[in-house]
Design a protein with these regions (language model features):
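Amphipathic alpha-helical interaction modules
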Residues: 38-76
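Intrinsically disordered or highly flexible coil/loop and linker segments, enriched in small
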Residues: 36-40, 67, 109-116
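Amphipathic alpha-helical binding modules
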Residues: 87-122
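Charged, compositionally biased N-terminal leader segments and the immediate start
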Residues: 1-46
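Amphipathic protein-protein interaction modules
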Residues: 62-101
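Conserved, well-folded catalytic cores of nucleic-acid-processing
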Residues: 33-37, 57, 61, 76, ...
Length: 122
């Protein structure tokens, strides 16, 4: 199990098939679930840029509309225990980064599952 004190490192930025539009699908999901403006999100193949943009959105939501942030986490089905673990951590400065990593990881898993379902492999 990955410690929440370390940043998730994506060996392949789009582990489920970059050639199949994972970056575009990720941006679309983030836009829908977190009201990110598509035009302001970095290029779809720039995971570091997308992550940085998402970190800023997490900071904004947590400080201005915490209930909406929690609602968004619930809507994308992020594990409540993982959210609690991040919020209880001693290192408060990395909370937005850890949430961004968790959101990206969950969104990529959702995309993979949807694609498997559509192709009849699930």
């Amino acid at each position: 199990m990955k410690s929440y004190n370390e940043k998730i490192v994506f060996k392949n930025p789009f582990p489920f098939g970059e050639g199949f539009g994972m970056g575009q699908s990720l941006v679309e999901k983030l836009h829908k679930d977190f009201s990110l403006e598509k035009e302001s999100v970095p290029a779809v193949n720039d995971l570091a840029g997308i992550r940085e943009h998402l970190i800023n959105k997490v900071i904004e939501l947590m400080s201005k509309d915490y209930e909406r942030f929690l609602s968004s986490m619930y809507r994308i089905d992020v594990s409540e225990s993982k959210v609690s673990k991040i919020l209880r951590s001693k290192d408060r400065t990395t909370i937005p980064e850890r949430f961004a990593d968790l959101i990206i990881e969950r969104q990529l898993l959702r995309i993979k599952t949807q694609r498997l379902y559509r192709s009849g492999k699930l």
